[in-house]
UniProtKB/Swiss-Prot annotation:
Gene3D superfamilies: Adenylosuccinate Synthetase, subunit A, domain 1, Adenylosuccinate Synthetase, subunit A, domain 2, Adenylosuccinate Synthetase, subunit A, domain 3. It is found in: Cytoplasm. Its cofactor is Mg(2+). NCBIfam families: PRK01117.1, purA. This is Adenylosuccinate synthetase. IMP binds at residues 12-15, 37-40, 129, 143, 219, 234, 298. Pfam families: Adenylsucc_synt.
Amino acid sequence: MVTIVLGSQWGDEGKGKITDYLSQDATLCCRSAGGHNAGHTIVHDSVTYDFHILPSGLVSPKCINLIGAGTVVHIPSFFKELSALADKGLVDVDSRVFISDRAHVCFDLHSVVDGLEEAKLGGRKVGTTGKGIGPCYSDKASRRGVRVGEILDEEVFERKLRNLESGYRSRFGELAYDVEDEINRFKEYRQKLKPYIVDQLSFLQKYKNDDRILVEGANALMLDLDHGTYPFVTSSSTGLGGAIQGLSLNPTKIKNIIGVVKAYTTRVGSGPFPTEQLNEFGEKLQVAGREFGVTTGRKRRCGWFDLVLCRYSLAVNHYTALNLTKLDILDDFDEIKVAVAYTLPDGTRLEDSYPADPNLIEKLEVEYITLPGWKTNTMGLTKYEDLPENAQKYVEYIERGLDGVPIKWIGTGPAREHLIIR
């Protein structure tokens, strides 16, 4: 049995927490796409762990972890993150994580190019994390990228990296980058990395009859290269299709597709955001929710819950259950708004589809309903019946608005135990 956890909005929904909870019973936890641009925090036994490229199943001592073929891996960050987890007391992290030999290598070169490309876009920049993810995926699509398995072949690796550097230097001129310096650093990584590299397909065959495989999505559906608010998206497939493709999953083995939705909406970086609140409500959400990016430290843009967006996300990803997170952040609001429809400039009303044109999204009007707040502390609650009546009504309104897909888990705080299971 395969369970897939996916972000339903623009990321930062709290996927790591439910993944951490579910990984307690998982044999294998996998990352299918993305790189160290992703970021989430897990609080376990009062210890805070920050994850970027590593699967958060590492917090569970019996869980094996795989970084799949659809990912891009910055090797220095991989080792730095492993070391940080070990320093915080996680056991056997070195022996419980593996990387597909088909994953692509994200170089420091890609980070340099990322910054140059963003600078050229000026006022229409995407707002990337600056980690080089886009240029790395671009090299992959152009068939000039370097795969993790190729690191082990010194001659091939060095030739391909020099060719990459030469191509970018022809395009941009002088680069603040020394290719020989990066090549020399990989001389140190080569043997160190070897035990982690596996043939993904044969590796997964060992688990084909196991009913406890957990897939941890990165980013979220609205950042998907095909289905998100293009071009203000990441460079990988962040939805259900990307999970299947990046890990060569058997679709018939998928039992659960869990959509993680924050009780309000946030976004990092540029791009349209219909329910964004550039006022005291947005600021209050930002402060109460501690909305700062784990990867970049940037303030997240904040706004009301968007049913239109989440209906679209549901239609693409086919969620079988939902995890509503950070409900407690709304505790101090007198009233809470939910977006239920958009009106386009020509008068067309949309309830369950999302415009492809970002310029059109910027011009639409949002229709809200207003629900009463509950003005009661819900942090740390673990029983649904203990929620204030208005908090229950809020949960059930969202559930009805999303075709009755059950909200099985409700987050009421940052720790693993701050969770209501319905």
